[in-house]
Amino acid sequence: MIPRYRAWIKSLKWMCDVTNISFDSKFVDICQQGDTERCTEMSVEFDEIKLMQSTGLKDKNGKEIFEGDIVDYKGRKALVSWHGSYASFIYRFVDELQKRNAEWNPLYLAYMRCEVIGNIYENPELWEVNG
């Protein structure tokens, strides 16, 4: 599998598809999200963006799941992230994130029952805990 990425441009508050990453020069080539076939690419520096990797999985509606996405799983909001110690994408329920020992779950066991409802950058209200 070739890893896919998307990027959040901090200053523009804009989500885009990543078409190329240059680790030597620390630049990322981007296109408007969903329009990589006919877009005009531009390059941005690493420190101008938040880079998010695709999990390689799709939700129950066939939508690609990226780290930073917020999914609905059995009526609860959960954040998708990378767990380095276990080399796996996980989800943690948003209402438990403030707990010191918040439970995490491997995404590969639940992705077909999840639905992507937004992400932490474009939909910060989903990130908030009510109560």
Functional labels for PLM-detected ranges:
Residues 1-131:
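Secondary-structure transition motif
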